[in-house]
Swiss-Prot record:
SUPFAM superfamilies xrefs: HRDC-like (SSF47819), P-loop containing nucleoside triphosphate hydrolases (SSF52540), Winged helix' DNA-binding domain (SSF46785)
Residue intervals of the Helicase C-terminal domain: 427-583
Record Pfam families: DEAD, Helicase_C, HRDC, HTH_40, RecQ_Zn_bind, RQC
Biased composition (Acidic residues): 19-38, 54-63
Enzyme nomenclature, EC number: 5.6.2.4
Protein's name in the database: ATP-dependent helicase wrn-1
Motif DEAH box boundaries: 348-351
InterPro entries: DEAD/DEAH_box_helicase_dom (IPR011545), DNA_helicase_ATP-dep_RecQ (IPR004589), Helicase_ATP-bd (IPR014001), Helicase_C-like (IPR001650), Helicase_HTH (IPR029491), HRDC-like_sf (IPR010997), HRDC_dom (IPR002121), HRDC_dom_sf (IPR044876)
Length: 1056
């Protein structure tokens, strides 16, 4: 692991993710056959830019980026009084050189208007009280709204088309108070009037299974939430009880609340160990924006900053440190001096501790040294991660020396992520298929997008292609300058670019909740890396898409890296196993989500039916374009043929091509025949295509029946051999059933050739493509579905004017977003660090008009309400005057409390937002899709989920009538044997019918009313009586792939 004190090299030694040297392979197709080209031999993508243009526009990235202090002079008015009294001294190491990483603030000396460097800062130390004491011009927590709100509102509405004018207005507003709201580096902390909690009270809270009011108040004050998520309070109270813990929570679930709230409750300090400087920067900035005192200390921190932390430790709530820094002599001495204030040591991204994880870092192993010190050994320790198998968890616990740790886990399943896999062909064509265009953003993927690539060269190529076709993108890898990396990171965080193309090292360093797309252009390193990297998408709970474009040659590059990584043999073997598991996800014809999740939790139950908005395979099955019952294939006979040929003809070690040629009767291999049994095997598989045999071999390798070995003379390739599992199976002669791939299902003839292998039975390889999944509707109606216009609770509630309401809500949301962007630019932070997208959605839907009504806004901390609340409220008031839209909408006036409670229990966050918007505003699916920036098919799928739980919809707005429901019921009973699993034959059976999306709702209503027949002996429907689906022109598709939660037009139908 690289120390924070060191200059960052272009690679991380010993890591699987390190960049290949120029002599190693990147893009060659046949690694085993030929030595790959070097980077210098490859064609490069050129750009018609001058050298200066390239320097100005190109970006770079690295996971351990440290904000530099590039000084860009700009004229702003500065008061003499502040300049004289608020000067921060800098040590001798400070300079204008951007590579020095100096964190001190520059204050001008005397003139009223001077050249003032704008410092790009990684926030370190702040206070309000000390500045008030130093400066004659005191300031409060926010801009004086009495003085500037009216003027700012008018200017904000009129001047967003002119960014330079906007910047000057906001700078002038700040200098009215003489101090920016975000204080600069090198300053002290604010005093919070929080009473010290005695030990008895702390232990009382630790014993409470339900959170006390004090905890709920702190949660609302700092995080804006009115209640804890499941298991969050359990983790918090165990911290209060002084217990060690291992916490495994999926990305976006709220791990930070678990380790941040205890210090805020107890008025104590938490030391957070985090692997990446960029991640620490983002998290500290977010905490400060909420009025929480936090500091980051790393190898670039000055001695002044260390001294200021030591002198103000009673005020600091959080210290973020890298593992190298916290275990250094200087770091341990600081912990010792702060010991009486420290209540918790939090190890974030704890999977880095384990050598069996995908991102092992040796520096994390040294954290156990803290437990060796008598003065620090009693600090409670909590290890947190979103990615860990049982083996990794046990390794982390052992290496950190956690004492009888309490283990808390949540589901790995992130339902708002849609998984899709594609073959990579032409770069521009592959990526262009999923783009949209608008006047403001140009071409984009529907929201902030991260594209991961395996090599720096591929990053540069993808970025060049994107720019050429009009995408605002930047590249981010270790090969360029620190300034370029910093600019790319900052511009992406602040939405100045829509897409960032990066090497996989960038993944853990992103802390942006509204990433809508994660695209892998090239195969990920392994299944755990893939899960970690797609975890960057949709952390705000909104629908997001995860795509992989890959080719088999990508696997060769990864295997080459593994073989040459000089890691322990057992570690390489484990990483290779995880690569095989990923390959299964990429090639399966079944649910990709299921294949992904069962790696982390073998007990994860396979869903009984296809899941809406789950993955591309489920979408294909819902459309009727694929048979879900054929996710397992029987390849007993063919496997025996292949294994016998490998052992008898090639002495158990060979490339896969020669045994296949032998089985298919190639004249190249007939010279090997020496016995009668060998003659019988020669050409026995000639009726089966070559690509089918290769797919079978790949599947047997993934399943562990075939192994890979590298002979001494083989530099790049490897050969296959029967594994111990394969040898045992060959002796037993049992059935061989493996996970199907599209080629295994489609590429083989239905009738297998008669077997000539003793003891082998006729193959039942692929199931008939006419079989369809079964989901049998119950025979009798068990309850009646009530739409919204028949629901008594909804009919008796307060009505609101709905004419044009969805459009008005969307317009208001746009104005609110513009104000947020303006404030973010003023403070030089990302827009989501001002308030989240969810908060803006609440403002647009509930429309509060006073400070007291801000309590209805969930997710907005007390500090955010104080600083920014009036800006958004004023915008709502002005918009209401212009449009007449209703304000101060109480959710209980529109939706009964009982219904709200049910929604919260049975619907995910993303589904609940879509359902609530439809229910309150009586919107059509198209209106909801436009407002939320997702596809119309996604809206229908989400609403169908609500219907299956019995929640009411405005069916008249969705073009669903009782007549259509009756027609659909009759068709499924008469023609399909009550099988509602697949929509395509159902549509054909009905004739003139609603479209697929409306049929989704009808099916959900029928399932709610009749239930499903769960008997094991249910008869399958007669395939012969079903309408033919052989004509592709009659097969429709369901555009159910989610796109984005940004305000953009809904996606067109996807080609899957």
């Amino acid at each position: 692991m690289i120390s924070d004190d060191d200059d960052l090299p272009s690679t991380r030694p010993g890591s699987v993710n390190e960049e290949l040297p120029e002599t190693e392979p990147e893009d060659n197709d046949e690694l085993p056959e030929t030595e790959p080209e070097s980077d210098s031999d490859k064609p490069t993508v050129t750009s018609n830019k001058t050298e200066n243009q390239v320097a100005d526009e190109d970006y770079d990235s690295f996971d351990d980026f440290v904000p530099s202090q590039t000084h860009t002079a700009s004229k702003i008015p500065v008061k003499n009084k502040r300049a004289k009294k608020c000067t921060v001294e800098s040590d001798s190491s400070s300079s204008d050189d951007s590579d020095q990483g100096d964190d001190c603030e520059f204050i001008p000396a005397c003139d009223e208007t001077q050249e003032v460097p704008k410092i790009k800062r990684g926030y370190t130390l702040r206070t309000r009280a000390s500045v008030k004491n130093k400066c004659d011009d005191s300031w409060d927590d926010g801009i004086d709204e009495e003085d500037v709100s009216k003027r700012s509102e008018d200017t904000l509405n009129d001047s967003f088309v002119d960014p330079e004018f906007m910047d000057s207005v906001l700078d002038n507003q700040l200098t009215i108070k003489g101090k920016k709201q975000f204080l600069d580096d090198g300053e002290f902390f604010t005093d919070r009037n929080v009473p010290q909690i005695d030990e008895a009270t702390k232990m009382k809270w630790a014993s409470m299974t339900s959170p006390p009011q004090e905890a709920l108040n702190a949660l609302n004050e700092f995080f804006g939430h009115k209640g804890f998520r499941e298991k969050q309070w359990d983790v918090v109270r165990n911290v209060l009880g002084g217990k060690d813990q291992f916490v495994l929570m999926s990305t976006g679930y709220g791990k930070s609340v678990c380790y941040q709230l205890p210090s805020l409750l107890l008025n104590s300090m938490t030391v957070v160990v985090s692997p990446l400087i960029s991640l620490m920067n983002d998290q500290v900035t977010t905490l400060v924006s909420k009025g929480i005192d936090a500091v980051k200390l790393d190898g670039h921190s000055t001695q002044i900053e260390w001294d200021q932390v030591a002198n103000n430790m009673h005020r600091i709530r959080f210290i973020y440190m890298s593992p190298e820094m916290v275990t250094s002599q200087k770091g341990l001495e600081l912990l010792t001096s702060c010991r009486k204030h420290i209540s918790l040591l939090a190890i974030d991204e704890a999977h880095c501790v384990s050598q069996w994880g995908h991102d092992f870092r040796n520096s994390y192993r040294h954290l156990a040294e803290i437990r060796n010190r008598s003065d620090l050994c009693n600090i409670p320790m909590i290890a947190l991660t979103a990615t860990a198998t049982v083996r990794v968890r046990d390794d982390v616990i052992a290496n950190l020396r956690l004492r009888k740790p309490l283990i808390t886990t949540t589901s790995f399943d992130r339902k708002n992520l849609y998984i899709s896999v594609h073959s990579s062909k032409d770069m521009a064509e592959d990526l262009g298929l999923f783009m949209k265009t608008d006047e403001v953003k140009g071409r984009h993927f529907g929201g902030p997008t991260i594209i991961y690539c395996q090599t720096k060269q591929m990053v540069d190529d993808v970025n060049c292609v994107l720019r050429r076709i009009g995408v605002r993108s930047a590249h981010y890898h270790a090969g360029l300058t620190k300034n370029q990396r910093e600019k790319a990171h900052t511009d992406f965080m602040r939405d100045k670019i829509t897409t960032i193309v990066a090497t996989v090292a960038f993944g853990m360093g992103i802390d942006k909740p509204d990433v809508r797309n994660v695209i892998h252009y090239g195969c990920p390193n392994n299944i755990e890396s893939y899960y970690q990297e797609i975890g960057r998408a949709g952390r705000d709970g909104s629908p997001s898409i995860c795509r992989v474009f890959w080719a088999p040659k990508d696997l060769n590059t990864i295997k080459f890296k593994l073989r040459n990584s000089q890691q322990k043999e057992e570690v390489v073997e484990n990483l290779t196993m995880m690569l095989r598991q990923l390959e299964l996800v990429l090639t399966t014809v079944g649910c990709r989500r299921y294949q992904l999740l069962k790696h982390f939790d073998p007990s994860y139950a396979k869903p009984p039916t296809m899941q809406a908005d789950c993955c591309d395979r489920c979408t294909e099955m819902l459309n009727g374009n694929q048979d879900s019952s054929s996710s397992i294939v029987d390849v007993t006979t063919e496997s025996k043929w292949l294994f016998q040929v490998i052992n008898e003809m090639y002495n158990g070690k060979t490339g896969i091509g020669k045994p296949i040629e032998f089985l298919r009767g190639s004249s190249k291999e007939d010279w090997r025949i020496k016995t009668t049994s060998q003659q019988k095997l020669f050409g026995i598989g000639k009726h089966i295509p070559d690509k089918w045999w290769k797919a079978l071999a790949a599947s047997l390798r993934i399943a562990g029946y075939l192994g890979e070995v590298r002979l001494m003379q083989m530099k790049f390739g490897s050969c296959i051999t029967l594994s111990e599992l394969g040898e045992r199976w060959l002796l037993t002669g049992k059935e061989m059933k493996i996970d199907a791939t599209p080629i295994l299902l489609q590429g083989k003839k239905e009738k297998a050739a008669p077997s000539t292998v003793p003891g082998a039975s006729r193959s039942q390889s692929t199931k008939s493509s006419t079989e369809i999944p079964t989901k049998i509707l119950g025979a009798n109606k068990i309850r009646e579905y009530e739409p919204a216009n028949e629901n008594e609770q909804l009919m008796n509630l307060k009505k609101q004017e709905v004419t044009g309401l969805p459009e008005k809500i969307d317009q208001l949301r746009s104005r609110l977003d513009d104000i947020r962007v303006g404030i973010a630019n003023m403070h030089e932070v990302a827009p989501f660090q001002i308030v989240s997208n969810t908060v803006l959605d609440c403002f647009a839907n509930l429309r509060p008009t006073s400070a007291s009504n801000l309590e209805m806004i969930d997710g907005m901390s007390a500090q955010q309400k104080s600083r920014y609340g009036k800006r958004f409220v004023d915008c709502v008031v002005q918009f209401s005057k212009e449009t007449g839209i209703a304000t101060n909408v109480n959710a209980n006036d529109m939706i009964p409390p009982e219904l709200i409670s049910k929604m919260q229990k049975v619907l995910s966050d993303a589904v609940r937002r879509v359902y609530t918007e439809h229910l309150i505003s009586r919107s059509t699916a198209k209106e909801v899709a436009t407002a939320r920036g997702i596809s119309e098919g996604t809206v229908y799928s989400y609403l169908a989920m609500a219907v299956e739980k019995g929640l009411p919809l405005h069916l008249d707005k969705l073009n669903v009538s009782r007549k259509n429901i009756a027609m659909a019921l009759n068709a499924v009973r008469v023609h399909l044997g009550s099988n509602v699993a697949v929509l395509t034959p159902w549509v054909e059976a009905m004739g003139v019918v609603p479209d697929f999306n409306q049929l989704k709702l009808i099916r959900a209503i029928l399932i709610y009313e009749y239930g499903l027949d769960t008997s094991e002996n249910q008869e399958k429907p007669d395939i012969q009586s079903m309408p033919s689906t052989s004509n592709p022109s009659t097969i429709k598709t369901v555009p159910s792939t989610p796109s984005s939660s940004l305000r953009a037009p809904p996606l067109k139908k996807f080609k899957l």
